[in-house]
């Protein structure tokens, strides 16, 4: 059997991709113009201290010049960002042309993209902006020599973007079982991700299947805060003033730890062990495993797994919704949410799925893949309501360990239906129109197949089975839709767990998640360099936007230099 080619090699052999997306064929459509959402008002500012103008891509005619251009350099030449100006102005909360003369928000967007992709800190970026070696970048960003933003100006830019991302209060209502409904605020910085994804489509880089049969996967990522951990038990109350009349409660003492008495002047406004610059940061010990249940590296007994394993994080969690292109083997971030590290993932992930339709009206959702952390009812129900297939790893429960209960409830610990005598059903395909999976017993009891679970006091093979009649050639037929007959949906999946189809879908999604993880590792964004939830949120949205944009440039480069002979 021939080895599976790498993603780069596979794309180089994709004649349709090379024919449509190499520079020779795409140059007549350049520049790709940033799409401005309909209804977005123009920027109220009429003058700026800098001014971005698209400067063309004439140097790309020389193929030798490509060797010296990074993916970021190609982005500056392939895309006209003028349409982004009103979007950023709205996200910055600008409503009037009065007041100070700001820098062009597109200039700052490009400057921060330069910082992120070059893995520089803020001070180094501003220093390089004034360096004569980088005069061409300064010109393409739209800055005048000697007129640059300060570090404080960049901090203010990020703070404003993060604050106004959800300042409208628009929210998605998520219904929970046996709990009050939750309102998940919509992050309008997602307009940046939508614009970048639309540029990928305009360039013709997506395969037709990627959009018509969308495979999406949420995958939370922990980020250490810029502030260093002082107390793992810190809560909102630690940032409230204290007095002798109303002493501040100590969450650490509630956990029978030493804690802080908060009886000194240093603790008057805020506990001295808190982190005021990252007041929303929280501590979590992540002991879960991203390994699927069928992975050979997963521990057989989770209780015997190495003690103390896992990751400790004091900070935040980004939650992207990734679109994986299974044909051309790359991914983009469709939507993103950002929260504290200890926040639950299933509810905001469900909200992101509901937001796909308003942000991407023509995207056809086919399959949603996720690890066991998303295997809760609210997320599984949302996928079903959106008429997509559930390929979410199984979330274990104590009841799964008792095999004697499997025939009574009607399914095993992997969601495979069982007959009342403990024989496993055989999968017979997914009915997308009726949104249910069909199973049949195939008269396993008459074919010498061992039952998965034996019942005490029952003779095998059982003679009293009502489906052994010759008039029923397939035996008992069972259709499983949203739930099993006992009302549970925890183990209901629309692709048999562990089957080749399951593994193919799951691996595609995991590759997308690992690809984003590798990008964040390379850009050194696992520990945030900015303080506070607003700045951290804005920086994460910018990073995912630039990840998509540099992916566009990288794929155009590959198509341009592909040898399809």
List each model region and its residues.
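An internal, acidic/charged active-site-proximal segment
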Residues: 343-452
């Amino acid at each position: 059997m021939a080895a599976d080619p790498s993603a780069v090699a596979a794309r180089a052999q994709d004649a349709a991709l090379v024919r449509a997306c190499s520079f020779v064929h795409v140059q007549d459509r350049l520049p790709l113009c940033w799409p401005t959402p309909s209804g977005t008002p123009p920027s109220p500012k009429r003058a700026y201290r800098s001014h971005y103008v698209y400067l063309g891509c004439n140097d790309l005619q020389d193929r030798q010049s490509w060797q010296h251009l990074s993916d970021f350099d190609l982005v500056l030449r392939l895309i006209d960002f003028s349409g982004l100006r009103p979007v950023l102005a709205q996200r910055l909360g600008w409503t009037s042309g009065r007041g100070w003369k700001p820098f062009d928000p597109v200039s700052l967007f490009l400057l921060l993209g330069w910082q992120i992709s070059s893995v520089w800190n803020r001070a180094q970026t501003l220093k390089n902006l004034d360096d004569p070696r980088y005069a061409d970048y300064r010109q393409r960003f739209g800055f005048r020599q000697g007129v640059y933003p300060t570090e404080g100006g960049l901090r203010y830019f990020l703070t404003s973007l993060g604050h106004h991302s959800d300042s409208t209060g628009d929210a998605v209502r998520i219904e929970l079982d046996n709990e009050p409904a939750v309102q998940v605020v919509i992050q309008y910085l997602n307009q940046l991700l939508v614009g970048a994804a639309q540029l990928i489509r305009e360039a013709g880089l997506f395969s037709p299947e990627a959009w018509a049969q969308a495979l999406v996967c949420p995958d939370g990522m922990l980020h250490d805060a810029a502030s260093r951990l002082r107390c793992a038990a810190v809560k909102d109350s630690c940032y409230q003033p204290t007095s002798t009349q109303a002493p501040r409660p100590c969450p650490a003492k509630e956990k029978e730890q030493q804690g802080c008495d908060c009886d000194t002047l240093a603790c008057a406004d805020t506990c001295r062990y808190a982190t005021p610059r990252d007041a929303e940061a929280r501590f979590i010990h992540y002991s879960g495993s991203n390994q699927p249940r069928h992975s050979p590296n997963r521990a057989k007994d989770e209780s015997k797994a190495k003690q103390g394993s896992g990751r400790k994080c004091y900070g935040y969690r980004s939650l992207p919704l990734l679109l994986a292109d299974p044909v051309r083997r790359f991914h983009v971030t469709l939507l993103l949410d950002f929260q504290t590290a200890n926040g639950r993932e299933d509810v905001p992930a469900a909200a992101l799925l509901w937001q796909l339709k308003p942000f991407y009206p023509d995207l056809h959702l086919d399959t949603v893949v996720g690890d066991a952390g998303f295997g809760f009812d609210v997320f599984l129900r949302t996928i079903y309501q959106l008429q997509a297939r559930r390929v979410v790893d199984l979330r274990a429960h104590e009841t799964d360990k008792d095999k004697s209960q499997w025939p009574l409830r009607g399914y095993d610990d992997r969601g495979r239906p069982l007959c009342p005598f403990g024989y496993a059903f055989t999968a017979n395909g997914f009915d997308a129109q009726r949104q249910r999976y069909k199973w049949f017993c195939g008269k396993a009891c008459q074919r010498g197949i061992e039952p998965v679970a034996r019942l005490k006091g029952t003779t095998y093979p059982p003679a009293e089975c009502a489906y052994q009649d010759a008039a029923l050639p397939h035996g008992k037929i069972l259709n499983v839709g949203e739930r099993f007959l006992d009302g549970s949906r925890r183990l209901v999946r629309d692709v048999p767990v562990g089957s080749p189809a399951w593994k193919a879908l799951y691996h595609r999604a995991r590759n997308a998640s690992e690809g984003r993880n590798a990008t964040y590792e390379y850009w050194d964004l696992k520990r945030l360099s900015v303080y506070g939830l607003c700045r951290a949120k804005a920086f994460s949205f910018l990073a995912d936007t630039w990840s998509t944009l540099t992916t566009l440039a990288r794929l155009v480069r590959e198509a341009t230099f592909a040898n399809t002979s």
